[in-house]
Amino acid sequence: MTSVNIIALVLAGGEGARLLPLTAEHAKPALPFVNGCRIVDFVLSNLANSEISPIYVLAQYKPQSLLRHIETTWNKSSRGGNCSVNVVLPRTGAERFLGTADAVYRNLDLIERHRPDLVAVFASDHVYRMDVRQMVDFHLARGADVSVAAVPVPIEKAYSFGIIVSDHDHRIRDFQEKPDRPVPLPADPDRAYASMGNYLFNARLLVDVLCRANRRGETDFGRHILPHASRSHRAFAYDFTGNHVPGVRSHEERAYWRDVGTLEAYTGARRDALGPQPRFHLENSQWPIRGIRPLEGQRELARRSRSRDGLLTHDSVDARPRPINVPREIYESIAHGMQASA
């Protein structure tokens, strides 16, 4: 394992508008997934299992349930191990984060305080397992200034992602944020190379590019920082399909990764984690997802998922109406999960 000083900044401040009405009162990373864990537990577990600490979660929108979950599951529990997880909020209401890059820029004091070699800037709304140290090794071996974790996605869905154009040695030649006409992979016209929203930066470079971006009024990694970096610095794409995590079962989908930013994707990922041979098995003693309870109730959730023909309009949870576009099992999970952490 490579020995370098790394801190992690987890981006958790977005409003999650595509997941409304679930995110009307809760931050997207705090939404329950399956069996007790929240969406944010996947990135935190990957960083903790990779022995990267400290971790700072940059929150903003509806942060109360996220704060409560991290405090009880990570900071007041043995599940957190030796990993330090801290939630950082905007200092005043007038200083709300204007974008992903602005969120990090407003917290550059964390980098100055720890003086790391590398800064991991990771998204908080994806379901996956990843050994981040393998990406660190790739970054160092390439002499990279910035590395972007990437995964092939179907070309018809690529417009929803930041798309990477790279050459044979993974050097990024162009970065296009949610393009109307995504550039396909050279050897596979049906797929494009998508950013996972996980970045490694040399610390000094990150401070410099964010200060320059702030002077230009640029606030977003995908729209501003990465397109510039791909032209002016050594930027590389780390192929997530080559990341190997111990304990993955033979029936699981290799290099499983899902962006759960829509109701359809969120529901689909939950179903992938259910059943006797799930695509993504939540239990893995060699790479645990912190916050997971024993899989009680898994069969019942799977039964509901399989038997659902349509979307009902009401549920018995607290005798409150359920929005018509939210499946029963999703609404019940949200209601019960939030009650449990209250």
Predicted regions and their residues:
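Short aromatic/hydrophobic "clamp" motif used to bind/position activated sugar donors
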Residues: 119
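Active-site-proximal specificity loops/subdomain of glycosyltransferases
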Residues: 82-104
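Short aromatic/basic micro-patch
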Residues: 97, 129, 200, 220, ...
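Active-site acidic Asp-centered loop
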Residues: 122-124
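Well-ordered alpha-helical segments embedded in enzymatic catalytic cores
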Residues: 39-43, 102-106, 225
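N-terminal glycine-rich phosphate-binding loop and ensuing alpha1 helix
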Residues: 2-75, 83, 92-94, 110, ...
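Left-handed beta-helix
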Residues: 1-7, 204, 211-342
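Conserved core of the sugar-phosphate nucleotidyltransferase
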Residues: 115, 129-204, 213-215
